[in-house]
Each structure stands twice: as structure tokens, then as C-alpha cells.
Amino acid sequence: MTRSKPNKNTKKYLKHNKGFYGRKKNCLKLAKQYYIKSLFKKYIDKKNKKRLILKKKIALINFFSRIYFGLSYSKFVYILKINNCKLNKNIILFLLLKTIV
């Protein structure tokens, strides 16, 4: 009876850690630890990337609304809210860019 399951798991970790430096790439115990750590960092970085993109969108909306309407971002969003305009930041930015060009 061949034992393929443990070898499959070993290959999974070692295949993922191919570009790592030192024992992280070929020592199974360390490979597992750094595999889990890399997945956790990947999750955190995805969240940070979304946060950064949102900050940039808000900064652009603020920039264009100050130049063309003379309003800050918060006042611009407040006016939209008063007029029951339920648009997300992507659409607002798209519309501002379209009106400029």
C-alpha cells in the first residue's frame, strides 16, 4: 500500500515556498509555518490595498469637487445625500471625470 497523502501535503507546502530563502523552502516544519504566515499576510495586504484605493478615490473626488464646484469632499457628499442621490464612490469619480473631459 503506497502512502501518497503525506507526500501530497509535503509537496503542497514545498511547491508554494519555492522562492523563499534558506530553510523556509525545503524544511517541512518551517515551510508549513511560513505558508500559513504568507496566507495571513496575503489577507491583510488585500484589505490594505482596498483601503489605499478608497483613500485615493476620496482624494480625487475631493480634488475635482474643489476645483469645479468649490466644495470640499464632505460638503459634496452631504449635498448628494440631501438630494437622495445614492451613488457609490466609483460612480461619483467616473461622473466627475466624464464631466471634465
Swiss-Prot record:
InterPro entries listed in its UniProt record: Ribosomal_bL20, Ribosomal_protein_bL20_C
Example of a GO MF term: structural constituent of ribosome
Family: Belongs to the bacterial ribosomal protein bL20 family.
Organism superkingdom: Bacteria
Protein name (database record): Large ribosomal subunit protein bL20
UniProt KW keywords: Ribonucleoprotein, Ribosomal protein, RNA-binding, rRNA-binding
Biological process according to GO: translation
Gene: rplT
UniProt cross-references to Pfam families, sorted A to Z: Ribosomal_L20 (PF00453)
Function of the protein: Binds directly to 23S ribosomal RNA and is necessary for the in vitro assembly process of the 50S ribosomal subunit. It is not involved in the protein synthesizing functions of that subunit.
GO CC annotation terms, alphabetical: ribonucleoprotein complex; ribosome
Top-level taxonomy: Bacteria, Pseudomonadati, Pseudomonadota, Gammaproteobacteria, Oceanospirillales
